[in-house]
Amino acid sequence: MIQHLALDALQRHLAGSPLYAWATSLPAQIAARIEEGHGDLARWWSAVQRLPQVQAPTVELAGRFALHSERDAALQPQVKEALQGLIPWRKGPFDFFGVQVDTEWRSDWKWSRVSPHVDLRGKRILDVGCGNGYYQWRMLGAGAESVIGIDPNWLFLCQFLAAKRYLADLPAWHLPLALEDLPEKLEGFDTLFSMGVLYHRRSPIDHLLALKDCLKRGGELVLETLVVEGDASTVLVPEDRYAQMRNVWFLPSVAALELWLRRAGFADARCVDVSLTSVEEQRATEWMRFQSLPEFLDPQDRSRTVEGLPAPMRATLVARKP
């Protein structure tokens, strides 16, 4: 499996950069992770291998993710069966040869809110908590030089490799690692995305400091997270669950989040978007059949979660490493 992560190509791509030494250490580190394994990894990898080995002469990444060929209709039964072996699909949507993968999240909506505020042309990008790589492909569509995503979830890796099967030559890599697995002071990326990660961290300031260590001087952080209304002293700490999630720790106001960024050493922090998450943007589908946002909100008051807390509201902030 490790050869399909294209780590040799990543080393060639990073030769001569501050990230090259790190790249040379990755094969041993990831081989050890694969050795640890996961009970479902063989089944998920088998689904990827059942995808037809064909070319995708038509690729769309700028306005959406879509792969097409002249044989779309003939390919669709095999493609759909293989991709259904990777359910649940959280982030998307994807169009594989006319098979519409209607994911739990309309991630294209978030991307339409975020992308106008960052110039990715020619940038080397790190996407922390990249999920199945949907945003990595969209970043390439926005002109990024290369995108490395990290996420320790094996299902997400296999979903990424399903797309990479048809986009092998594009400079996108998914590493099954957490931020904590990266060396300190990498300082090699122009732009870093952390979307939907901060509220899962027990120590949000430490997370921001670790993100800053990955950026070059002058590099840009794009931070998207759950927020609440309030001033710079407002932070919600759920007593137990938030929208049925146990691993949510801190929901700051936008003003508090800007303060956190300044304390972590970032400059020029600005909020570029605040949006309530709608039940049209996050919901169960054929490709993600479990409970989703409609079940996590109070049925009598959609402005509250089932726990009585403010319904999900997300902010995107952009800041610079001086």
Swiss-Prot record:
<feature type="binding site">
    <location>
        <begin position="179"/>
        <end position="180"/>
    </location>
    <ligand>
        <name>carboxy-S-adenosyl-L-methionine</name>
    </ligand>
</feature>
<dbReference type="InterPro" id="IPR029063">
    <property type="entry name" value="SAM-dependent_MTases_sf"/>
</dbReference>
<feature type="binding site">
    <location>
        <position position="314"/>
    </location>
    <ligand>
        <name>carboxy-S-adenosyl-L-methionine</name>
    </ligand>
</feature>
<dbReference type="InterPro" id="IPR010017">
    <property type="entry name" value="CmoB"/>
</dbReference>
<feature type="binding site">
    <location>
        <position position="110"/>
    </location>
    <ligand>
        <name>carboxy-S-adenosyl-L-methionine</name>
    </ligand>
</feature>
<keyword id="KW-0808">Transferase</keyword>
<comment type="function">
    <text>Catalyzes carboxymethyl transfer from carboxy-S-adenosyl-L-methionine (Cx-SAM) to 5-hydroxyuridine (ho5U) to form 5-carboxymethoxyuridine (cmo5U) at position 34 in tRNAs.</text>
</comment>
<feature type="binding site">
    <location>
        <position position="91"/>
    </location>
    <ligand>
        <name>carboxy-S-adenosyl-L-methionine</name>
    </ligand>
</feature>
<keyword id="KW-0819">tRNA processing</keyword>
<feature type="binding site">
    <location>
        <position position="195"/>
    </location>
    <ligand>
        <name>carboxy-S-adenosyl-L-methionine</name>
    </ligand>
</feature>
<feature type="binding site">
    <location>
        <position position="105"/>
    </location>
    <ligand>
        <name>carboxy-S-adenosyl-L-methionine</name>
    </ligand>
</feature>
<feature type="binding site">
    <location>
        <position position="129"/>
    </location>
    <ligand>
        <name>carboxy-S-adenosyl-L-methionine</name>
    </ligand>
</feature>
<dbReference type="InterPro" id="IPR027555">
    <property type="entry name" value="Mo5U34_MeTrfas-like"/>
</dbReference>
<comment type="similarity">
    <text>Belongs to the class I-like SAM-binding methyltransferase superfamily. CmoB family.</text>
</comment>
<dbReference type="GO" id="GO:0016765">
    <property type="term" value="F:transferase activity, transferring alkyl or aryl (other than methyl) groups"/>
</dbReference>
<protein>
    <recommendedName>
        <fullName>tRNA U34 carboxymethyltransferase</fullName>
        <ecNumber>2.5.1.-</ecNumber>
    </recommendedName>
</protein>
<feature type="binding site">
    <location>
        <position position="199"/>
    </location>
    <ligand>
        <name>carboxy-S-adenosyl-L-methionine</name>
    </ligand>
</feature>
<comment type="subunit">
    <text>Homotetramer.</text>
</comment>
<dbReference type="GO" id="GO:0002098">
    <property type="term" value="P:tRNA wobble uridine modification"/>
</dbReference>
<dbReference type="GO" id="GO:0008168">
    <property type="term" value="F:methyltransferase activity"/>
</dbReference>
<dbReference type="Pfam" id="PF08003">
    <property type="entry name" value="Methyltransf_9"/>
</dbReference>
